[in-house]
Amino acid sequence: MEARVCVLFGAAALLRLLLLCVGVYQDQTLKLKYTDVDYHVFTDAARFITQGESPYRRSTFRYTPLLALLLVPNVYLSLLFGKLLFGFCDLLSGLLMFRLLVLRGASHGSACVSCGLWLLNPLPMAVSTRGNAESVLAVLVLSTLLCLQLRKHTTAALLFGLSVHMKIYPVTYALPIALALTAAPARGRGVLLRFFSPALLRFAAVSAAVFLSLGLIFYCRYGWEFLQEAYLYHLTRRDLRHNFSPFFYLQYVCAERCWSSGLLPLLLLPQLLLLLLASAAFSSDLPFCCFLHTAVFVSFNRVCTSQYFLWYLCLLPVVLPRLRLRLGRGLLLLLLWLLLQGLWLAPAYLLEFQGWNSFSWIWAASLLFLLTNTFILAQIIQHYRPHDRKAD
């Protein structure tokens, strides 16, 4: 590995270790804690598992028990174990990005620059060192794409099934993956026959077997509570508190109406339509299509928080070298994205900490943020160079 790659990863590791030390100091001395409250939820759930009880005895633990099992060393070794694990997954994500970029024809220099936007990005650094598990899913998603790029379809299917078990949103990649797997060998066949290709059937069988097996194991152990907290809660969740999605206000004002439950299918329609269009248009370039899928899913979701941004930011470095955006335009789009977040945070702060009734201002800022995200995605699509198979 080149010296500059080693320097990049070494600097990224040191920065994360530094943030861990800062977090320990802040937690011990300041009123405002560094550690994410979810990290304490994960640890408590792991402690219940070590006692032979259900992790769902910990209120607000709404994840797979597999996550609690990963953090059992928090109980026996050190509370820092999980943060070290998540930080390591951050670095591993960067390595997977580098491999993907090189496979897609990027030079080592270009790959280093793109990976640096993840490895030296303060957002993923802060999220992982505060104890949020998003980096684990980033590793699974990037590993799936890398194995598909290497045409290791069985391994990719195993990882994809595990990804969907960990969190629901990667299931949106199913259609792009299906189209990508059937594109080359199924030319000349009917549209429906393409979906019966051996490669796709094998991928579907393996990924479904992984997902269903893990689900069955945990259902037998923890019963309906597992299905409710790990999956059904997220499918039916209505966040009436303020978040980046403009749909939160609609759910807030209609919460007490008898017909409010009928809003859910309507809120899903924009997402579904855009995901179908993205699949049809860009499935030949799977990493780019998955990036668009995730960005659309997050932007148009009925609940959107800042940690969701990592779901597509971990894919952005992989597609970045094929963007033909001028540096000035790219920086302007980044500034616009950050500015609109600040515009949203101002009334959210007034509501949360000052008690002001600023719901309408938050809603207006959420609408502007959605429009901004849509504009940025349109710019990315417009300036993206189509996938060149020879580069692989």
UniProtKB/Swiss-Prot annotation:
**Membrane topology per the record?**
Multi-pass membrane protein
Per the record, the pathway is: Glycolipid biosynthesis; glycosylphosphatidylinositol-anchor biosynthesis
Q: Does the keyword Membrane apply?
A: yes
Residue numbers on the Lumenal membrane side: 26-65, 149-156, 220-261, 324-330, 382-392
**Which compartment or compartments is the protein found in?**
Endoplasmic reticulum membrane
**Which ranges does the record mark as transmembrane?**
5-25, 66-86, 126-148, 157-177, 199-219, 262-282, 303-323, 331-351, 361-381
- UniProt name for this protein: GPI alpha-1,4-mannosyltransferase I, catalytic subunit
Identify the species of origin: Danio rerio
Q: What is the lineage of its organism?
A: Eukaryota, Metazoa, Chordata, Craniata, Vertebrata
